[in-house]
Amino acid sequence: MAAEKIRVGIIGASMRNGWARDAHIPALSALPEFKITAVSTSRQETADETAKHFGIPHAFADPYKMIQHPDIDLVSICVRVPFHHQLGMATLNAGKHLYCEWPLAATTEQAQQMRDLAARKGARHMVDYKPAEPAGSIASGTWSPRATLARCFRAR
């Protein structure tokens, strides 16, 4: 019996520009184990535009409402760094898995808070930095919230 698809909500998924449009949505859409179920942007009209273009069922102007939606297992954060910590903490507090663009947070302390909360909640989290291969870990199939082992390939 096949495993259920991992349902993804993407924060910062504007059709007008950005990594979500150019990398995350195409990569996730190409993989059979993922299904994008929601997008969020700062304005409802751009969220609706993205959802319609890609055939995504839910669109939100409020990322926190999207995070709480029951049809989401994994949240992908594709917004500016100052918002990573707050959105990441909300995601983890909701019991969702987290995939975030680099850097995970603005400070080491914020990143440690997110790491600790993920451990307490039993959630998987990952930050991806592959400018030459956007959404590289998702596209290559090397990451899944169902995985039991994470490995750091590079650190500074």
Over which residues does each language-model region extend?
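Short, Asp-centered acidic motifs that coordinate Mg2+ and/or phosphate
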Residues: A38, H58, L74, R124, ...
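Hydrophobic residues in well-ordered beta-strands that form the structural core
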Residues: I10, F60, C100, H125-V127, ...
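N-terminal Rossmann-like dinucleotide-binding module
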Residues: M1-F54
